[in-house]
Regions:
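Short helix-coil transition/hinge motifs at the ends and kinks of transmembrane helices
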Residues: 9-17, 68-70, 237-251
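Short hydrophobic, aromatic-rich alpha-helical segments embedded in or entering the lipid bilayer
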Residues: 2-5, 21-31, 202-245, 254
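Short helix-capping/hinge motifs at transmembrane helix termini and TM-loop junctions
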Residues: 58-67, 145-150, 154, 181-183, ...
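Membrane-interface helix starts
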Residues: 31-50
Length: 278
C-alpha cells in the first residue's frame, strides 16, 4: 500500500482505531522512509562510514593503550561500537521528524485517513531497520579485524537483537527531541550535544573499573553502559564476562532489557503527546 492508496480511503476511516489498519499505515510510512535510501544510496553509505571509522580508530589507534588482562580488546570493543552506532543512528529519527515538520509533510499526513500513530511508528521502525543493517555491517567489519562471538550462535543473535532493541528505544528519545525543537539544524546540534557525554562516559570503549571513582558511579547506571555490558555478557565467554563485568551474566542482560523498557515507557507517551501538539 502506498501513501496515494491511503489518500483514496473513504473519509469514514479517518478516525479508525483498529490495530490492523494502524499497523498497515505504519508499514506504509516505514516503506516511504526506507525508499529514501534506495533513491539516494549515498545517505546509507555515509551513515555507515562513521561506525567503520570508529571501529578502526579504537581498535588500532587507541586499542594499544587499553590493556584488559586476558581479554582481546576487539571482543570488548565491538559491543560498545554496536551501541554507539545504535545511539548515533537513532539521532536520525528526530532529525527526520524535524525535517518532515519543516517541509509540511506532517500536516499532509494529518490530512490523510490514516492512524495518527503511523508517522511516529513508521519513522522509528524504518530507522531501526537501518540500524540493524549497520550493526550487521559492523559485525562483518569486526570479524575482519579479529572480533569473535564466544557464546555461540544463539547468544550472538541475542546480542545483535539487544543492540537493535536499544536503538529502537533510543529512537523515541530522538523523536521527542525532533518534535519539540522542530528545526533540523537545532535538532541535530541538540542531539549530538546531549548524547555525546552519555556515550563517552560509559563502558562502551573501556571497562568501568578503569574510570575515576566519581565517574564510575554515573557510568554504572548509564543506559549505554547497561546495554553494552548486556551485549558483552552474551558475546564473551562466561569466564571473561565475569572478569570484565562482574556478577552474573544474566543480570547484565536483564539490566539492559530493563533500561530499554524504561525508555520506552517514558518516551513513547511523551513523543505521542508532543506529536499531537505539532
Amino acid at each position: 500500500m502506498s501513501v496515494r492508496a491511503l489518500a483514496a480511503r473513504p473519509a469514514a476511516l479517518l478516525r479508525h482505531r483498529g490495530l490492523g489498519p494502524a499497523v498497515s499505515d505504519a508499514l506504509v510510512i516505514t516503506q516511504r522512509n526506507l525508499l529514501k535510501y534506495v533513491r539516494v544510496p549515498t545517505l546509507l553509505v555515509f551513515s555507515t562510514i562513521q561506525p567503520v571509522m570508529f571501529v578502526l580508530l579504537f581498535a588500532y589507534v587507541f586499542g594499544g593503550a587499553v590493556n584488559i588482562p586476558g581479554v582481546n580488546y576487539k571482543d570488548f570493543l565491538l559491543p560498545g561500537i554496536f551501541i554507539q552506532t545504535a545511539v548515533f543512528g537513532s539521532m536520525q529519527t528526530g532529525i527526520g521528524l524535524a525535517e518532515d515538520i519543516s517541509h509540511g509533510m506532517v500536516d499532509r499526513f494529518r490530512s490523510l485517513p490514516m492512524a495518527r500513530s503511523a508517522v511516529l511508528a513508521g519513522r522509528t521502525i524504518s530507522d531501526t531497520i537501518r540500524n540493524l543493517f549497520v550493526v550487521l555491517l559492523m559485525t562483518g567489519v569486526g570479524f575482519l579485524i579479529g572480533f569473535r562471538f564466544h557464546g555461540g550462535v544463539l547468544f550472538a543473535m541475542a546480542g545483535i537483537l539487544l543492540a537493535v532493541l536499544f536503538s529502537h528505544a533510543f529512537s523515541w528519545i530522538s523523536a521527542l527531541m525532533g518534535l519539540t525543537i522542530r528545526d533540523v539544524e537545532s535538532t541535530q546540534a541538540a542531539s549530538f550535544a546531549s548524547i555525546f557525554p552519555f556515550v563517552f562516559a560509559s563502558s562502551a570503549f573501556v571497562p568501568i573499573f578503569t574510570m575515576p571513582g566519581w565517574l564510575q558511579a554515573f557510568a554504572k547506571v548509564n543506559p549505554i553502559s547497561l546495554a553494552a555490558n548486556g551485549i558483552r555478557a552474551l558475546t564473551l565467554d562466561q569466564k571473561t564476562a565475569h572478569f570484565v563485568l562482574g556478577g552474573n551474566r544474566w543480570t547484565h542482560v536483564w539490566q539492559a532489557l530493563l533500561s530499554i523498557a524504561v525508555m520506552l515507557v517514558i518516551f513513547v507517551p511523551l513523543s505521542i503527546r508532543a506529536y499531537r501538539k505539532t
